[in-house]
Amino acid sequence: FMIETMHGPLALAHNGNLINSAELRNELMEQGVGFSSSSDTEVMTMMLARNGGGTWEERIKTAMAKWIGAYSLVILTRDCVYAVRDPWGFRPLCIGLLPNGGHAVASETGALQTLGCEAIRDVKPGEVVSLSNSALKVMQALPTVNPTSMCIFEHIYFARPDQVWDGINVHHVRQRLGEELAREITEKMGSDFGDVVIPVPDSSVPAAIGFSHVTEIPYNDGFIKNRYVGRTFIEPTDSLRKRGVALKFNVINENVRDKRVVVIDDSIVRGNTTCLLYTSDAADERSSV
């Protein structure tokens, strides 16, 4: 959201969700504030616009004390850029030094590397980092909640595999998860339960590689992904979801024909993707998450 305020222009970009957004919205409406959307990002923007204080740092700190939930923010004012992260550390946020001496802020380190950034650091939970005229200033606006609550789905699904979060590479985490899954399954089922391991692309590929390494079951591609189809699990009806899956994935029959197929996926909500194998030439299908 971008608005004009009594303190000057203000723009805010937000990754996350406030769980007390409705309560904060009602408080603002009782004060005469109007809204053009149902977004919690607009609520946060309006709170900053109405807050007193002599500096944007003070206004941000005051607002953070009222925000409950996940938020990684980039706030742009006339003279400064602020990187803000909630005290639980739900979502990632990082800062890099540009080759020309300026700074860039992004959710993922991969975006900063593309810009040629060096000296990349995470914005720590509860921090407000101000960037102005190549200078970087850090303020601990709220104490870090102990323990932190990093969203597990970042490592499993959301993040790009080249992302480094809290010093840990996402691809490495996913591969290790696949290895651990393989150990747990072989303890219960032995080692002779599959002929081929295939991932549901793309986020499950590292886990399938790790699973294959431990079980020594050959890894292969079983699905071809249409990269022009978006996420299907958020469609409003099951018929639309199934149609989306049919458009998004095609089975490579030659790689699964007459084989016991072990499918590795990051999560199973309704099983629509793995159901495609039942109409293929696979002899048997087993799903592991």
Locations of regions flagged by a protein language model:
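Conserved small/polar residues in nucleotide/adenosyl-binding loops
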Residues: 278-285
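Extended, hydrophobic alpha-helical segments in both membrane/secreted and soluble proteins
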Residues: 197, 205-211, 219, 260-277
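ATP-dependent adenylate-handling active sites, centered on carboxylate activation for C-N bond formation
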Residues: 185-187, 256-260, 276
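Structured, non-catalytic alpha/beta "coupling" segments that mediate domain-domain communication
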Residues: 125-127, 208-214
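Short, glycine/charge-rich flexible loops or terminal/linker lids adjacent to PRPP-binding catalytic cores
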Residues: 214-262, 272
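Conserved short alpha-helical segments that host acidic/polar catalytic motifs at enzyme active sites
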Residues: 1-125, 130-195, 200
